[in-house]
Amino acid sequence: MPINVPSGLPAVKILAKEGIFVMTEKRAIHQDIRPLEILILNLMPDKIKTEIQLLRLLGNTPLQVNVTLLYTESHTPKHTPIEHILRFYTTFSAVKDRKFDGFIITGAPVELLPFEEVDYWDELTEIMEWSRHNVYSTMFICWAAQAGLYYFYGVPKYELPQKLSGVYRHRVTKETVLFRGHDDFFWAPHSRYTEVRKEDIEKIPELEILAESDEAGVYVVANKSERQIFVTGHPEYDRYTLRDEYYRDINRNLKVPIPANYFPDNDPTKTPVLTWWSHAHLFFSNWLNYCIYQKTPYKLEDIH
């Protein structure tokens, strides 16, 4: 999928080298089809790395996508240069009168805090409430999935005995367009200290569990219309993300396990094995095509 992003975004050069089609604004205006308008609320500390990971996946189908990057006004990013934020990102107050075909809310390293103690929780709940009637389909990733399930449906999160880190085998539990083309079993990364539980989700008639893992638990949950999709893992992670997180934690003297099913021979000095790439690309492609492009109104103002 050609993606139309602001000129000068660092991700553009990297993705172009990988063969991802990044379209200039001048070329984009000459296409007759309406581009999909996708909003990304980037809550991850390393925003540039997350941009690359998500844009890589959004740029993998034949449709044109216009991407708008969003940050929270109530929290000042500490790990990304403010110049980058001011140049490439916008605020909720600047977009709240617009409508979007799709919306991605990323994970965030705040999962051990009660939701209400997260410093941008009030702003996030305002944004999530806004998404009900101003976005056709929203994908919540990792902590955002827990936050969305809690805010919309009252699903609690639970602290795990130790960090869940690694790549785990999952199975599709319900046939749906999101998993069209998937094998019955596939692999996906997780990196978190908390979980949502199957028994809590099964009590809510509006929700369906679409994929799960014996080791990592619930993976993908969606409402009946698939306009809200909750992903408890990190399919967007690249080959080295779990490795980098592991060494970061070790350097902080944290007691964390070696990421499971990731390093050959469970040896952190060896190059990690990439086993989830086809799932990640197909999952995002299916979301864009089946959950958004084939269902969203042609006129954005008709989204409600």
Curated annotation (Swiss-Prot):
UniProt keyword list: Acyltransferase, Amino-acid biosynthesis, Cytoplasm, Methionine biosynthesis, Transferase
Q: In which pathway does it act?
A: Amino-acid biosynthesis; L-methionine biosynthesis via de novo pathway; O-acetyl-L-homoserine from L-homoserine: step 1/1
| Principal location class | cytoplasm
UniProt enzyme class: transferase
Site location (Important for substrate specificity): 191
Listed binding positions for substrate are 163, 191, 248
For the site Important for acyl-CoA specificity, which positions are given?
111
Gene3D superfamilies reported for this sequence: 3.40.50.880
| InterPro entries per record | Class_I_gatase-like, HST_MetA, MetA_family
Q: Where in the cell is it found?
A: Cytoplasm
| Gene Ontology CC annotations of this record | cytoplasm
Specify one Pfam family. Answer: HTS
- UniProt catalytic activity: L-homoserine + acetyl-CoA = O-acetyl-L-homoserine + CoA
Q: Which GO terms describe its biological process?
A: L-methionine biosynthetic process from homoserine via O-succinyl-L-homoserine and cystathionine
Stated EC number for the protein is 2.3.1.31
- Of which family is this protein a member? Belongs to the MetA family.
The protein's matches in NCBIfam families, at most eight in alphabetical order, are given as:
metA
Q: What does this gene product do?
A: Transfers an acetyl group from acetyl-CoA to L-homoserine, forming acetyl-L-homoserine.
Identify this protein by name.
Homoserine O-acetyltransferase
